[in-house]
Regions:
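Catalytic domains of carbohydrate-active enzymes, especially glycoside hydrolases
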Residues: 53-71, 126
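Structural preference for beta-strand elements that scaffold enzyme active sites
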Residues: 35-37, 64, 135-137
């Protein structure tokens, strides 16, 4: 009997979550207006995943941002799509194997925006800089499938 009650409770929770769950009771869009999100910020004048690119997107009228984060060796959360530093910065090596103090002066956008490079943004700094009314979709990057630390 207890198994039936637990199974029923599980099914009810699953149905409730699937059909009735809403993030923070916030209306994200209506049928007439889809939610348009700036993917990694607006990259027209600034490197992606930088505070400058997020502010640029907000100034352009975006009400939602998508940003990628990963964890450094010392536990800081930084905004970067890639683990390898060479792809989008003047750094060398892997972000997850480096302490934030080693990464904080690295310039992002050396290939895409050489006249407007920016430092790596920490998630904490982004949350302090971005207005509270902006919806954030934070994509957590993990180096392996089961790395959720």
């Amino acid at each position: 009997m207890i198994e039936l009650i637990l199974y029923s409770a599980f099914i009810l929770l699953l149905v409730r979550h699937r059909f009735f769950w809403v993030a923070r009771h916030r209306k994200l869009s209506s049928k007439d207006s889809p939610l348009i999100m700036a993917h990694r910020g607006l990259k027209t004048n600034s490197p992606e995943n930088t505070i400058s690119s997020y502010k640029e997107a907000i100034a352009a009228g975006f009400g939602a941002l998508e940003l990628d984060i990963l964890q450094t060796k010392d536990g800081e959360l930084i905004c970067s799509h890639n683990f390898d530093l060479e792809r989008e910065s003047n750094g060398v090596g892997w972000a997850q194997h480096s302490d934030y103090n080693k990464l904080k002066d690295i310039q992002m956008g050396v290939y895409t925006h050489p006249r407007n490079t920016q430092t790596i943004a920490r998630l904490e700094d982004v949350l302090n800089e971005i207005p509270k009314n902006i919806f954030l979709n934070i994509e957590i990057k993990t180096h392996s499938l089961f790395d959720l630390s």
